[in-house]
Each structure stands twice: as structure tokens, then as C-alpha cells.
Amino acid sequence: MDPKLLLCLPQGDELFNPLNTMFIQMACILVFSQLFYLLLKPCGQAGPVAQILAGIVLSPVLLSRIPKVKEFFLQKNAADYYSFFSFALRTSFMFLIGLEVDLHFMRRNFKKAAVITLSSFVVSGLLSFASLMLFIPLFGIKEDYFTFFLVLLVTLSNTASPVVVRSIADWKLNTCEIGRLTISCALFIELTNVVLYTIIMAFISGTIILELFLFLLATVALILINMVLAPWLPKRNPKEKYLSKAETLVFFIFLLIIGITIESYDVNSSVSVFAIGIMFPRQGKTHRTLIQRLSYPIHEFVLPVYFGYIGFRFSIIALTKRFYLGIVIIVIVTIAGKFIGVISACMYLKIPKKYWLFLPTILSVKGHVGLLLLDSNYSEKKWWTTTIHDMMVAALVITTLVSGVLASFLLKTREKDFAYEKTSLESHNTNEELRILSCAYGVRHARGAISLVSALSGSRGASDPFTPLLMHLVPLPKKRKSELMYHEHDEDGGNANGDDEFGTNEGLEINDSIDSFAKDSKILIQQVKLVTQMLNMHEEICNATEDLRVSIVFLPFHKHQRIDGKTTNDGELFRQMNRNVLRHGPCSIGIFVDRNITGFQQPHGFDSVQHVATLFFGGPDDREALALCRWLANNTLIHLTVIQFVSEESKAETPVGNAMTRDNNEVFMEVLGRNQTEQETDRSFLEEFYNRFVTTGQVGFIEKLVSNGPHTLTILREIGEMYSLFVVGKSTGDCPMTVRMKDWEECPELGTVGDFLASSLDVNASVLVVQRQRHSHDSFIDD
């Protein structure tokens, strides 16, 4: 293509060159896709379906069937422009997918994804071979059956990972187990197809083996360069929250150079670009900048245009009856292959039956590598005609639309199967992924949240299921715009100044604290920013809790400890926000009273073992607090002690301790439940915890016999200096051991015991008050 035509108008009477018409086409796709999305969203349809339909509207089937429109959109040399910009769009979103992919989840579920990929590929291959027997006489193919079989195999077995990623995100399944497994399978299937096809074609041609080796070296070299640049660039401007736009451009230029070089040899660059993204260093300012700068334009502009271009390729005008039959066969074989292969793998892997229909349906979508392979140069193959090409493209588009509609229908009709379930810790197995969300207004709260993350992470390897998230809460003044347009952001990509009323540039200090912790502990904390008015903040937190599917949310207490050891009130608005979250929270809630000077310190980097105590009076909140301590017990830098309080009135009853063997001769107290069922639940849970952790020596166990509330206060004062952190449930009900303690209660949101520990001058430890999930987040009452 003549470079002069890229930016200049053609000579003659034409008003527009292909570049201009392409941009107009992109604008039309965005407009139509928004209209379709508004119409289809109430039905549960994902964005890609609406965007493909927008492309079909502009395709030769509809608007481009009009001669003037066709002449406008499909000009001379237009194919070259479409090819180049398709490459640029593809490079950007494959790199972003690599940056965003959950590596820890993919490692943990590698076997599942690999088995599903293999099973799907094998079944699709067998059905492709059977279909080949039909297509050879149907289309009169007389030579080179193997190449046609390869094209058919890769086309039918492929899954378009960008369509899957975007659909899963629209359905808000990208934080749940099945959603991330679907994304992993889609990536495995697509990358396997690309690698297999490239290798086979290389051996057939015998001309690009050396080039493939050089491309591999170039990809590895860029990965190594990124590993050097990623930590070095932030040091140039340590006071900036993000890298500059010029520095960001450096990474993208390197990426385009590699991609263009590979594509110039007719080799697909998707694998290399994705590998560069997935191997990019995940911690630090550079990764955070790339995610922040690329996410919005790619999700809102690049992907819609790319999906629209898939629909624009749809053309069935020139097809005859036998090719329509071919479309039907391809659609049926594609979906059947995915269903048989994926369901067989699900049976082998013992994946719950409720996901058996959804997985193969969404994995049947096409449109990425399939189209690239169909656009390859088969000019020397006599069987490869424009009609066969249009038939294959039409089949892929129809398959994607059918699969997308069916998947959304399954989600709509079986919504409970995909609902947010792990809302409490009591029934949460420690082998399952623990997702926690810590909220922070400023760097002081962030450091306390990091301490909790450090404690709960235990002595784990990178493959263990633990996902911490930190939400930076920025209260918005009433008269300030709650949302800024993308072009209204500053150079850092954030708000006007990134500040809040707790101090200057809190966001930068929070980032630095998280980066420092990640560097020392190798634990990555995902960051979320919430900018909203204080009166609505509790609702936004609850919405985010459901979207992120966390099991417990940690909120900062509305008071903080000063350097002199005294406490200062940060404001009643923050206290009221905590109360609202406790009232409406869709999962368990913890309020962290951080005495960072005299209390709990971050275990990672701390020289000595810290002593932590959990106080057990009985009831669902205390069981939830004890359940949380199962993760604390796995941390070798923490010595955990369970202190159970038993009323003297229940001493005559059969104590829980009689069912346990223990060497400790201190007084052991019985749980006084509000009813027999509650007592049995407490007893059963405590015995299970005792047998698992106490008998093995991981956790200490003490019984305290008390008569009333004042006696309990005396014991709490005695142990106040012995521990750096107390973990306690919020509510003890009408327990006689806390009677008359409410007379001195200052903060009811902490519960009777938690309020005393947080306000007493005799206690210097930090306090974590836990409330079990009580309400479903369906609606909010005006507080």
C-alpha cells in the first residue's frame, strides 16, 4: 500500500479516502452498538452480541447492499487499511488480556483448563473429519484435503477469547470461579489452535522454521526488557502516581514493532503479544499505569469496533443452497463438538452439573483467530473460493450470535446457580479461595489493611487461593461531579488532584505502601478506587462487594490512635457509613480498630512472633470470628490463642472441654447459648476447630470462668497487655457474661466486648470486630 494514501486524499472526484471512510464506519459501529446494547441489555445480552449486530447492519447484507453505501465503505485499497487497523486493535487487546489475566487462578486450575481444552479439541477434530466427508462432494473439492481439513479443524474448534472475556465481564462473572475458568479455557483453546496451526503450516511450507525460532527469541527478549524497564521507570519520577504518557508509549511501541515484524512473515502474532502481557511484572507503578491507561479505551472503543468488524464481514448474498447447507452443518458441528467435549471433561473433573450447559455454550463463540485463519493466503488452493470464504465467515458469525444468546438465556433462567454464595467464613473451606476487601480512606488505614492481609495470607506459596483487594475510599464533596469523562482526567489519569481530606496525595502513598509490601512478601493486592458522596458510600461498597464476590469486608474504625497513644475522632460521617455497611452488607463485615503504635504490626518484616487472641462467648458472630482465625493460625509469625468464656451458671452442665483432651489446667468455660440449637452449633464448631488446630499445637486454648459482666471486664483488663490483636464477634446476644457491660457502651456498632476493648485505656492492642452476614443486599433503606 502506498504510504502517501494513508494520510492524503486520493486524486480525482472522490471526497473520502479509505482511511476516512474507515473512521466513519467505526463511528457508525459505535453508535449502532450502543443502540443495540440499550435494547438487549434488559434481556441479559452481553456487549459483543450487540456489537456484532451493529456490524451486520452495516454489512453487505443490509446497508452496504445499497450501491452508494457499498461504494463509500468498500473502496479500492480498503482491505489494506482494514487489515492494518485490525492488527493494531488485535495487538492492543491481546496485550491487555495478558495483563489482566489471573495468573494465580490459572496456575491452580491448569489441569482443569488443559483437560477441557484437550477434550474439546479432540471431539471437534473427530467431528471435523466426519464433516470433511460431507464437504468434499458437496463443494467439489478434488485436491489438498489435508489443508482443507486443517482449516476446518482450527475454525470449528477455536474459541474467540476476546468475545469470552468481554462477555464474562459484562455478566459480572469475571470474579467468580466459573467465570475465570471459562476465560482460562478460552485462552488455552485459542492459543493452542494458533500454535498448532502455525507449526503445521511451517512444516508444510518448510520455509519459516528459522523465522519462528527468531520470533521466539524476539518475544523472550522483549519480556526481559520489560522486566528491566518496569521497575526502573517508576524510579525516575517517584512522586508521580502514574508513569507519563510518553513512558507508557515506549512499551506500546516495542509491542507494535514485535507484532509488525512477526505479521510481516504471515505468522500470527497473538501468542507473542499475549505472552508479553502475561509475563509483564505485576507489581508496581508500571503495571498499574498500563492497566489504567489501556482498560478504558480498549473496552469502550477498540473491542466494540473489532466485534463490529466481525459482523461487517457477514455476507451471504452470493451463496447458493448448498452453501447454506454448509453453514447449517458448520454451526451444528461446532456447537455439538463443544458440548460433547466440554461436558465429557466436566464429568471427568467433577465440575458441578449446574455449569455443564453454560461452559460449552460460551466456549462456542468465534470471531478472532478463526477469521485470521480464513483470511490467510490460500490463493494457490483451487478449492479456496470467495464463496467458501463467505460461507465460513457467515457460519462463524451465526455461531457466535447463537452461542451468545443461548449463554445469556442460561444465565437469565438459572440466575441462582451463578449467584454470589460465599458470604460468610463459617462454611468456607480453607482450601478454597479466600477473597477479602479492605477499605481505606488514607495511607494510615491502608497500612492497617495491609497488616491484616499479611496476617491472613499465612505462610503460603503463590499458588494458594488467597485474593486480597484494597478499596481506596474518596469522599466526594456534594457539589463536585461524581464522574469525570476520560478526557477530563489529569496526566495521572485520576481525579483533579488525587487528594482527599485525610492528607495530600493519599493515593500515591497508598500505592507506595502496597508496592513495598508486594516486593517484600510477593503477595499482590488488587486495588479498587471508589469516588462517591459520603451519604451513598455504603451502597457503593455493598454493590462492589457483590461484584467482587468477597467473603468479608474490613472497614476502618472512625477513630485513630495518635502518636501520644490517645484516640481522635475522624468524624460522625465515617461512623455512620460503617453502621450502614453493617446493616446492609451482603457478606461478613469486620471493623478494624488499628492501634498501629502499641498494637498489631504487619507480620511480614516484623522481627518477633505476635500474640493474637480470639474471644469466644458464643453465637454466630463469634463463630465467624473463630472461622476467620483459621487463616491466622496458618501464619508462623502469629501465635493464636482462643479464649473461651463460660458462665458459672452452666458449670454444672456437661462442658465442651470434656470432649477434648488438653494439658492446660486453666479454667475452661461453657458456651451459654440462647437456645439448645445455638449451643449445639457452637459446641460442634468449637470442637472441630479444637481438634484441627489446638491438638496439633498450632493454636493455644484457654477457658475463663466468669459470673457476670463486671467479672468479664476484670478478666479483659488482665489480658489487655498480653496480646497485640483481639478478634471478637460483634454480638453476644443476651449472654449473662456481658450483663451490665452495656452501661458504659460508646460505640454499639462494635458490640459490647469490642466497644470495651476499643475504648479501654487498659487495652493497648488492636481490635478486629467481626459480624457475620445477615442480610441480602436487595434494597437500601434511607438511613
UniProtKB/Swiss-Prot annotation:
GO MF annotation terms: antiporter activity
GO cellular component: membrane
Main location: membrane
Any one GO biological process: proton transmembrane transport
Tissues in which the protein is found: Specifically expressed in pollen.
Transmembrane parts of this sequence: 19-39, 43-63, 81-101, 121-141, 145-165, 186-206, 208-228, 242-262, 300-320, 323-343, 355-375, 391-411
The UniProt record lists the keyword RNA-binding: no
Highest taxon listed in the record's lineage: Eukaryota
Keyword tags: Antiport, Ion transport, Membrane, Potassium, Potassium transport, Transmembrane, Transmembrane helix, Transport
Membrane topology, as annotated: Multi-pass membrane protein
Pfam families referenced in this protein's UniProt entry, alphabetically: CHX17_2nd, CHX17_C, Na_H_Exchanger
Function description: May operate as a cation/H(+) antiporter.
Family: Belongs to the monovalent cation:proton antiporter 2 (CPA2) transporter (TC 2.A.37) family. CHX (TC 2.A.37.4) subfamily.
Name used for this protein in its record: Cation/H(+) antiporter 2
Species of provenance: Arabidopsis thaliana (Mouse-ear cress)
